[in-house]
């Protein structure tokens, strides 16, 4: 269930084992968050489509526009003849901010995931001249850079912690700054203001960092008397994502945790219902794409064991071939100077405005050869 990275990974590895696999996907396209939440300037859709086409050619049947809900349940799937079910529905529910004025029917207010998805599938999105983004993760940065490309004159991010706590890479952060995104650290919105049901701006307060909280990051604390108002025509809330369990009918036999996620065995990804497994962001919450792919592979191994009647633990073996070290001799005149990685070329800033062209470009042939030659100095492992 779900044609995102986890579901497709599970389907691929099961198909490689010889099983007939069917994937049910609610949307008209596959790829999950890769297709509908990551903008084209970071990951072009055609790249994902090629990967999905390859998986389909491996024997995986992908049924699009087929949501799992109260009318077509997990139990219905089992009853229709499938011997095992793997739930990989992702974490596609935007978390609420929990402040006054957070109303989806106010003109100019969006949740980050919905905003990115609407833009990606070509749905008309109205953006004001001044855009405020609430949050500090990848969805917040992607939303801010997307808003610029849609024609916003000014885009500002409001993040309640410092740069050190901001969960984005240096590359993504630096690229956003280079494109003109303003980042306001240690600032927390307290209210979304509207004028006649149209976004008017954010009421905010400055913060200071206190002791670490449960996440290990220092807890932001409001500074009394530091309140201020930030005008904006559009507000995009991007403070996190969570799994959406609304497709489960009332009284579903599937057990949940106190965090409202499916309860699974951490090794075998099995739920309390025999033959039903779950994994990826749907179980763990938002993570890295490679972690989602690994969860799909683990799910495939677990399902294979289940169908074979094998109750042993799932072991994830490294698929890399072993390498044997051999001593080599060299001529004295040979250079052993370190060869550094060539810099990745980027689309010039002036070509990014109003364009969703991929900004991280490919190496030229010369640079590619230069990079390949560095492999002659690789550290080998047995």
Language-model features, listed with the residues they occupy:
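N-terminal Rossmann-like FAD-binding beta1-loop-alpha1 element of flavoenzymes
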Residues: 1-23, 139-148
């Amino acid at each position: 269930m779900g044609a995102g990275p986890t579901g497709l990974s599970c389907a691929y590895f099961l198909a490689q084992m010889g099983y007939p696999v069917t994937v049910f996907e609610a949307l008209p396209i596959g790829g999950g968050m890769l297709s509908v939440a990551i903008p084209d300037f970071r990951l072009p859709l055609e790249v994902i489509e090629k990967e999905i086409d390859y998986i389909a050619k491996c024997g995986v049947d992908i049924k699009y526009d087929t949501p799992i809900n109260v009318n077509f349940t997990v139990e219905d799937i089992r009853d229709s003849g499938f011997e095992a079910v793997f739930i990989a529905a992702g974490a596609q529910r935007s978390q609420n901010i929990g402040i006054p004025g957070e109303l989806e029917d106010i003109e100019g207010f969006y949740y980050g995931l919905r905003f990115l998805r609407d833009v990606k599938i070509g749905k008309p999105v109205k953006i004001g001249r001044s855009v405020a983004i609430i949050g500090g993760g990848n969805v917040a940065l992607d939303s801010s850079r997307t808003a610029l490309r849609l024609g916003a004159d000014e885009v500002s991010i409001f993040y309640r912690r410092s740069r050190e706590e901001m969960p984005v890479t240096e590359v993504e952060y630096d690229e956003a700054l280079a494109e003109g995104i303003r980042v306001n650290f240690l600032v927390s919105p307290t209210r979304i203001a509207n004028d006649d049901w149209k976004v008017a701006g954010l009421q905010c307060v400055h913060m200071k960092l206190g002791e670490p909280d449960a996440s290990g990051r220092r807890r932001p604390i409001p500074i009394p008397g530091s309140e201020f108002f930030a005008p904006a025509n559009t507000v995009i809330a991007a403070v996190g994502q969570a799994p959406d369990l609304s497709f489960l009918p009332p009284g579903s036999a599937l057990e949940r945790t106190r965090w409202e996620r499916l309860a699974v065995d951490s090794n075998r990804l099995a739920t309390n219902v025999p033959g039903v497994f779950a994994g990826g962001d749907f179980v763990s919450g938002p993570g890295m794409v490679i972690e989602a792919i690994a969860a799909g592979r683990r799910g495939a191994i677990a399902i294979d064991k289940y169908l074979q009647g094998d109750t042993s633990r799932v072991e994830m073996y490294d698929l890399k071939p072993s390498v044997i070290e051999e001593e080599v001799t060299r001529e004295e005149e040979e250079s052993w100077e370190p060869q550094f990685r060539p810099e990745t070329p980027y689309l010039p800033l002036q070509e990014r405005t109003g364009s969703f062209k991929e900004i991280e470009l490919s190496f030229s042939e010369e640079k590619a050869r230069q990079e390949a030659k560095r492999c002659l100095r690789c550290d080998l492992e047995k």
